[in-house]
A protein has these predicted regions:
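Active-site microenvironment of metallo-dependent hydrolases
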Residues: 1-99
Length: 99
């Protein structure tokens, strides 16, 4: 789990220098996905919320399923249901960060 956190959260922040992302500490955005590690589900296109409406992973069965998402401290998904309209924000980067 610690390796996964590094790959998905801390690593991109180190690599790209994204301001306020990658950690759960005071002053950072509270971006969290809650995952039920015991849940097993088949991925289907009808679950995809992206504009394209499909995924190349359709038909695959996976163990571990997102059950909630919090973005900037606001709950946006619970039990597979989107709770609010999308509300994107411009991302900021530390000067001189990146590859």
């Amino acid at each position: 789990l610690l390796r996964l956190i590094d790959l998905l959260c801390e690593g991109p922040n180190r690599l790209f220098g994204i301001v306020g992302k990658g950690r759960l500490v005071v002053g950072y955005d509270a971006d969290v996905t809650l995952v039920d590690l015991a849940a097993s589900r088949e991925i289907t296109d009808d679950w995809v919320a992206a504009k394209c409406g499909w995924t190349p992973f359709a038909g695959m069965t996976v163990t571990g399923w997102p059950v909630g998402t919090i973005i900037r401290g606001r709950s946006v998904m619970r039990d597979g249901q989107l709770m609010n309209e999308p509300s994107g924000q411009v991302m900021r980067f530390y000067e001189g960060a990146g590859p």
